[in-house]
């Protein structure tokens, strides 16, 4: 899928170097089709790295996508130049009246903070409610998945003493679910989180299905029956070195993190990571775009129906 992004966005050169098709605004304007409108609410500290990871995964099907990068507040991120934020990001207030075919809400390094103590929690809940009226299908990743479960269903995560870190084996629970079309019966995916919600709690919610899970780390992909919400508790978007970088960062900060499981050869951090999740990660995003976004969204987004309120 050619993704339509602003000229000069740093991710463009990275993606072109990987032979991933991007399209500038002028060329896109000459295609006589309606592109999908997808927003990315980027909560990660390193905005540029996350942009590359997600744009890479959005690029693999044959439809055009307009991508809006959205910020949740005006505080300057520690790991991204302010000039980048000013050039490429929309404040939520500037898109509040817009409707989207799809929205991705990223994870955030807030695992050990109570939701109500998060500085932008009030804005976060406003956006969660806004998405019910303005977005056809929303994909929540890691922290955002747990935060949305808490807001919509009152389900509280537990915080583990030791972080889930590594690449874990998962199984397909519902092979007929379109999100998992083309998946192997078992597959691997990265996780990096302290928070955990027991699978039984997801199953207790009417209209939600745990379509893929792990014996080690629990529910991985949870989907609403109406396709309007998808909760992914891991990080299918991660680059090969992301878990390694997080591990080394925590060590440098004086912590004693666990060595990421199933990631280094012989559990030796001096070796190169074993990458065994990228094909399924790409397939998950492709299936979401095709079956949960493109196949269900109205051609005229002004006709987008308000989602019924989740039952708490």
UniProtKB/Swiss-Prot annotation:
**Cytoplasm: is it a keyword of this entry?**
yes
Q: Where are the catalytic residues?
A: 142, 235, 237
Q: What is its main location?
A: cytoplasm
* Subcellular locations according to the entry: Cytoplasm
Q: Which UniProt keywords apply?
A: Acyltransferase, Amino-acid biosynthesis, Cytoplasm, Methionine biosynthesis, Transferase
Organism superkingdom: Bacteria
Which EC class is the enzyme in? transferase
Q: Which residues bind substrate?
A: 163, 192, 249
Q: Which GO terms describe its molecular function?
A: homoserine O-acetyltransferase activity; homoserine O-succinyltransferase activity
Q: What does this protein do?
A: Transfers a succinyl group from succinyl-CoA to L-homoserine, forming succinyl-L-homoserine.
Q: Which family does this protein fall into?
A: Belongs to the MetA family.
Q: What is this protein called?
A: Homoserine O-succinyltransferase
The gene coding this protein: metAS
């Amino acid at each position: 899928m050619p993704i339509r992004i602003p000229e000069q966005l740093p991710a463009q050169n990275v993606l072109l170097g990987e032979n991933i098709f991007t399209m500038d605004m002028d060329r896109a304007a000459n295609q006589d089709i309606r592109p999908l409108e997808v927003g990315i609410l980027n909560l990660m500290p390193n905005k540029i790295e996350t942009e590359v990871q997600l744009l890479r995964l959005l690029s693999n099907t044959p439809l055009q996508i307009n991508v809006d990068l959205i910020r949740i507040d005006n505080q300057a991120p520690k790991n991204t130049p302010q000039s980048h934020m000013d050039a490429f990001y929309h404040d939520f207030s500037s898109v509040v009246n817009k409707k989207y075919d799809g929205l991705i809400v990223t994870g955030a390094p807030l695992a050990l903070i109570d939701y109500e103590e998060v500085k932008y929690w009030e804005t976060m809940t406003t956006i969660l409610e806004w998405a019910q009226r303005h977005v056809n299908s929303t994909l929540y990743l890691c922290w955002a998945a747990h935060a949305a479960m808490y807001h919509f269903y009152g389900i509280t995560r537990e915080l583990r003493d030791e972080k889930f870190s590594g690449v874990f084996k998962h199984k397909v629970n519902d092979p007929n679910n379109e999100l998992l079309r083309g998946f192997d019966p078992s597959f691997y995916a990265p996780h990096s989180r302290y928070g955990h919600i027991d699978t039984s709690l997801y199953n207790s919610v009417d209209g939600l299905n745990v379509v893929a899970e792990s014996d080690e780390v629990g529910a991985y992909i949870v989907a609403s029956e109406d396709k309007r919400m998808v909760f992914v508790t891991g990080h299918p978007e991660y680059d090969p070195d992301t878990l390694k970088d997080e591990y080394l960062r925590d060590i440098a900060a004086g912590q004693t993190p666990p060595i990421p499981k199933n990631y280094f050869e012989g559990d030796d951090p001096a070796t190169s990571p074993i990458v065994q999740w990228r094909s399924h990660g790409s397939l998950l995003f492709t299936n979401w775009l095709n079956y949960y976004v493109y196949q269900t969204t109205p051609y005229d987004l002004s006709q987008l129906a308000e989602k019924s309120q989740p039952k708490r």
